[in-house]
Amino acid sequence: VTIVVTGAAAERQAALRQKLIRRVGEQQLTVDLGSPLYAAELSDAEIVERVACAGLRRGERRGTVRASAENAEQALSKAEVARVLDQLVSSLGPVRRVLLIPPDATRAHSGAAELTCALYARLASTANVRVLPALGTHEAMSEAQLRGLFPSIPLDRFLVHDFRDGVSQLSEVPASFVRHVSDGKLDYAVPCQVSRELTTGDWDRIISIGQLVPHEVIGIANHVKNVFVGTGGKESIDRSHFLGAVCGMESMMGRAHTPVRDVLNYMSAQLAPQLPLSYVCTVRKKDARGQIQTHGLYCGDDEGCFLAGAPLVQLLNLNLLEAPLDKVVVYLDPREFRTTWLGNKAIYRTRMAIADGGELVILGPGVRRFGEDPGIDRLIRRHGYRGTRHTLAELGQDRELAASLSAAAHLIHGSSEGRFRVRWAAGELTRKEVESVGYEWADPFALLRCYAPATLKDGFNGLPNGEKIFFVSNPGLGLWALKDDFARTPSA
């Protein structure tokens, strides 16, 4: 069990190996400096940080991968994707009952719907296959959405997750563990709750499908999150999200090893080993033509497939900038973003790159309310996005907010903490509504003419009036941060 470094001069390989051992400990790990993951211009310190950020910590179990394909420079071909799925299905052996768990319509860019249809086609001839979209706290998908995302799967094959009344509690992550991973910031247990469909279906295999991508609560989304949050219960979602908010999203986004992932990994390994879980994880990136392409596909039964894909996420989905941005304009596709609960990804994913005193303009023509859930919508309207200190103070005054910690976490995440301006141009919210929750209002129709998404490219743009902006066409595809600040944040 040792670290092997290849692809460079022997002297550099030996020196880098010692640095890696000091940073992550002795473990079975190969670092090929000839791989696109470790570009020639990276220093040894940057390579060590990249490995550490991927979650390869001292004593960590890497797990196994059933099937995978990866290409940092070119998108995977249809044949390569088909080969991986064929290998996965073959490795499962005979199965009678299979549950597929893809993300819902709010993750349409993940490519998971196509993979779900492909797996259904491979399995349905010999097995009873059902599909449970991982709604989390989101509203249920409509028939039109189901037909649009999963055209080849009959509607009677779909199940609906109810995070309030449709869950089973398996056990709980003890308070002592939460206290440890949060460095003493929190001292409560987190119940392990999953959809009752998982525990009562007599499944031979449960396959979770989704995209690995930087995320504000867990660091890198999907894998165990798709199961234990996407099909989780209210209290488990509340407490895990609040843990992320209290620990600070800026120290976690884009990181593979975070307190929230520690908690969800504990659930998977210690509290739910009886669930026959497998994972299908993608890594995707938008190409020069604006098409979102799959560059990595990893299948396995434990954290091995997640850890295999995490370095590629950091290579392709972290947009690290040399200097802070004065003005950022983010567009939210109305087919995907209909609430600030989802649309505030515009804030989460760009905040680390925005200059003090800078400006964020959010173009959300399809946004019609604040919360996905009526109760959470009511809490957002009552308390607004007014920063960490205000939200924590309100927790002591409002029992309803204290009983909905995921809403409190969202209020914290959705504030700039007064560091930069947020101008929200919501298509179906009034000026009074937008300003009542602490944002500056902007006219969506005027700004869509000024910043027409079809005329802008991702990144820096110069406008005819001389204005310079940084444009993001879909905040759900990555994280924008400063290179120096990101390198200095803790890898865990």
Where are these regions (language model features)?
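Short internal beta-strands
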Residues: 3-4, 127-137, 359-365, 422-425
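Acidic, Ser/Thr-rich peripheral helices and adjacent loops at domain boundaries
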Residues: 17, 21-23, 145-164, 371-404, ...
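Extended hydrophobic packing segments that form well-structured cores
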Residues: 69, 78-82, 417-492
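Glycine-rich phosphate/diphosphate-binding loops that line cofactor/substrate pockets in enzymes
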Residues: 84-99, 124, 201-202, 318-327, ...
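Histidine-anchored nucleotide/phosphate-binding helix
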Residues: 108-126, 343-354
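Conserved, well-structured core segments that form the ligand-binding/active-site neighborhood
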Residues: 160-324, 352
